[in-house]
Every structure is written in C-alpha cells, then in structure tokens.
C-alpha cells in the first residue's frame, strides 16, 4: 500500500512506500502504479517534501527515484539500511561500486529523529524484526507501520528473512502499542484475512491491543516467538524477493549497466 500524507494547512506532502511494477517473466518494469501517485499529486497541487521507505521491501520494487525525478522530495529510510546492504551485498556478490553506507538515500533516520511535512510533525520509531532497518513513521496522530503489524484479523509480519528476528519484532510492536489508543495505524500490506472479502488498511492502536490475533490481549513474547517461528517455517519466499532486494537496497536504482548497455539482476542459486 502506498500512502500520500498531506498537511491540511498547506500543499506539503510525503509519499510512503511507493511501487515500481515489475513483470518477472519478461524482466520489464512498468510505472503504472507510480504514475497514479503522480497524477494524484499533480491534481491536488501537492509539494512533495519526502519520499519515504519504511524498510527495504522484499515483495515489490521501489519507485522512489522515479517519483523524485518527477515530483521531488528527499528519499528517506532507516540508518540500519547499512546492515541490509552489507548482508545482501554479500548474497549478490556486489562489487566495490556498490556502496554499503546508505549514501544512495538522502536521509538516514535513527530512533527519535523528527521531520516536518509543512506544519505536520513527524517522528521516527526504529521497529526492527521483519528486517533490521524497519521504521515506523509517526505523523501527528497517525502511525505508518510498514511490515510490523497488519490488520488485527491478520496479525503480524514474517521474521525469517536474513537479519529478521521474532523477538525484535515483538519488542518493536510493544513500542507501537505504547502509543495512545486513538493513534491511527496504517499498515503496509493487507491480505484479506479469512472471512473478510474487502481490503483494509487503517486501524487504531487500541484495536490492535485488543484484537490482533498474534499479539493482542497481552500475549507474552515466548508465545509470540513460538507462533511466529512455526508459521514462518511454512511460508514460501516472496515471488519478487530477488529483484526487489537488489533494487531497493540501492534506493530504487537499478544495478549499473554492463558493457553491452543492458542492466541485469542476479539470481543466487540455493541461497535464500
């Protein structure tokens, strides 16, 4: 889910978790999803201040540079992107051209950092577990939680990627649940839990505390870790994890072209 967050008292806005469409079979990218965001930005006359990533996504490519070139904004992510870059720089055997210092991004956020979207005040929570670099952006009374909490009837994000940790995710979720009960929670994905036929993306901290099927009603950490570990062992890798990681750890840029002018994505065999 991509969000556009607008200051009601000005045209200032931010884009959170953009998508570049990608067809694995043909190796072709498509900007349809990003162009819908651009059309909305232009129709509303928005002044984009930020293009934010909650983490290095493993299931879709980021359109951050495409959006930045067309509507502006600084690209931001958590400072622990360097951990992800080091981990997957080795997985994909990246050469020295691939910088592992996060310099591909305009801003590296740390826990407690603040930022502004016009008159809106934002602050950063470091919420690792799904990945080491996951952030939650708390903007006034809204929390954009990425892949930590999902809708209460679906639960929580997986933790079995390299650098993931069920213990860390549980602790991160407690940090989110410590926000005021009325805080609006905007999730990064929705999968329509069994018995629900429509997509949903907004809930509240109070609803999550009371109703989340994985962590609600004060479930202890050891029960959560056991459940999450057993559940993750049954999950297949996301279909786009290999292309997504190579692009997203570069802030949405493609790997450099080879001497024939073509850009390639690697497939490490028997690795993930």
Predicted regions span which residues?
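Active-site neighborhood of phospho(di)ester-bond hydrolases with catalytic His/Asp-centered motifs
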Residues: 16, 47-56, 75-79, 126-129, ...
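A short, flexible beta-alpha/helix-coil linker loop
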Residues: 19-23, 150-151, 155-158
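Active-site-adjacent loop/tail segments of enzyme domains
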Residues: 156-179
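Divalent metal-coordination and catalytic microenvironments
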Residues: 5, 17, 55, 67, ...
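Active-site HxH/HxHxD metal-binding segment of metal-dependent hydrolases
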Residues: 13, 21-28, 32-120, 210-211
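Core dinuclear metal-dependent hydrolase active-site scaffold
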Residues: 4, 111-139, 178
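Short active-site segment of divalent metal-dependent hydrolases/proteases
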Residues: 58, 133, 150, 192
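Accessory terminal helices/loops
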Residues: 80, 171-184, 188-272
């Amino acid at each position: 889910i991509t969000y556009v967050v607008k200051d009601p008292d000005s045209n200032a806005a931010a884009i959170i978790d953009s998508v570049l469409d990608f067809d694995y079979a043909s190796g072709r990218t498509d900007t349809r999803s990003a162009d819908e965001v651009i059309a909305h930005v232009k129709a509303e006359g928005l002044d984009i201040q930020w293009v934010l990533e909650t983490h290095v996504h493993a299931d879709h490519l980021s359109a951050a540079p495409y959006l930045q070139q067309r509507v502006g904004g600084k690209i931001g992510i958590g400072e622990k992107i360097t951990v992800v870059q080091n981990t997957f720089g080795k997985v994909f055997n990246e050469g020295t051209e691939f910088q592992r210092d996060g310099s591909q991004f305009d801003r590296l956020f740390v826990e407690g950092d603040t930022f502004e979207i016009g008159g809106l005040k934002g602050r950063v929570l470091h919420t690792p577990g799904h990945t080491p670099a996951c952030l939650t952006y708390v903007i006034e009374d809204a929390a954009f939680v990425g892949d930590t909490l999902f809708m209460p009837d679906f639960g929580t994000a997986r933790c079995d990627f390299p650098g993931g940790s069920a213990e860390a995710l549980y602790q991160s979720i407690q940090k989110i649940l410590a926000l005021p009960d009325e805080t609006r929670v905007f999730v990064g994905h929705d999968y329509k839990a069994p018995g629900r036929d429509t997509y949903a993306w907004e809930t509240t901290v109070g609803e999550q505390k009371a109703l989340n099927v994985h962590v609600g009603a004060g479930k202890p950490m050891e029960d959560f870790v056991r459940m999450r570990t057993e559940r993750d062992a049954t999950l297949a890798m996301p279909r786009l994890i290999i292309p997504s990681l190579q692009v997203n750890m570069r802030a949405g840029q493609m790997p450099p072209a080879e001497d024939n002018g073509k850009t390639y994505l690697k497939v490490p065999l028997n690795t993930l």
